[in-house]
């Protein structure tokens, strides 16, 4: 049986518990403390975090050996990839259960180490970051999205950001702020859009504007202004980027990040 509710006593009947609250470490730790109290001994306890360190989450329980990450990609009923995340104390049998669950659900389970963003989001972040660089360098969101859908992507990165919500990436960036290398190139365009309340489709505006859920084709002057200001602050003379350059830079960013991953 599958239960989706907050009746904690039902956890005593569960062989596997999956937490799926929003990406806030303190909130997840509090949920796991409650799960630890109510779940039966030997139950597998999983977090659906997409990028947080799962070890502090596991440490909130008295049984970190039973905790692992099961990162389902959104929308979970469609996306095949399932990251099975190994914590420092995760027992081998618990990992085997996670992999078996993925196969049972007809997913593609991939075992990954406990690094920020795991595999999929780490590569995607490198891709998105390069696309943000291209905004500062002279491209517009529609230039980048059109070039990459032309390469075969179902959606471009800025359309994806609007669909999923810009605040998701914003929250992740704020979580990384304390450890970010000050020498690293950082593009604040997304931050400024979020501060202006432009969180994507759900607020009617993000990188693009929307009316009744449909993207407005007209150029968004507000977004153009934010991008032009970002370029000027960095001293960049904007230039047109050909689709081939956009495609090449995006792909090479992903290839480079993949080469740095040690599972």
Language-model regions, residue ranges each:
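N-terminal glycine-rich phosphate-binding loop for ADP-containing cofactors
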Residues: 1-261
């Amino acid at each position: 049986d599958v239960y989706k509710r907050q009746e904690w006593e039902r956890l005593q009947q569960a062989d596997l518990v999956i937490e799926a609250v929003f990406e806030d470490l303190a909130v997840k730790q509090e949920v796991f403390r409650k799960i630890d109290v109510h779940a039966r001994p030997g139950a597998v306890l999983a977090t659906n975090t997409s990028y947080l360190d799962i070890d502090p989450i596991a440490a909130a329980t008295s049984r970190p050996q039973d905790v692992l990450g099961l990162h389902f990609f959104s929308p979970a009923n469609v996306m095949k990839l399932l990251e099975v995340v190994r914590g420092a104390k995760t027992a081998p049998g618990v990992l085997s259960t996670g992999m078996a669950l993925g196969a049972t659900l007809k997913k593609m389970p991939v075992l990954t180490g406990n690094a920020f963003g795991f595999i999929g989001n780490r590569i995607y972040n490198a891709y998105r970051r390069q696309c943000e660089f291209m905004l500062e360098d002279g491209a517009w969101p529609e230039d980048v999205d059109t070039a990459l859908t032309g390469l075969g992507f179902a959606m471009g990165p800025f359309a994806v950001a609007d669909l999923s919500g810009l605040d998701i990436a914003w929250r992740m960036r704020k979580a990384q702020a304390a450890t970010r290398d000050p020498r690293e190139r950082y593009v604040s365009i997304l931050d400024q859009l979020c501060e202006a309340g432009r969180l994507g489709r759900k607020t009617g505006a993000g990188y693009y504007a929307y009316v009744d859920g449909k993207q407005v084709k007209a150029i968004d002057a507000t977004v153009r202004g934010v991008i032009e200001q970002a370029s000027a602050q960095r001293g960049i003379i904007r230039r047109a980027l050909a689709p081939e350059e956009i495609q090449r830079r995006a792909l090479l960013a992903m290839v480079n990040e993949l080469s740095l991953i040690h599972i």
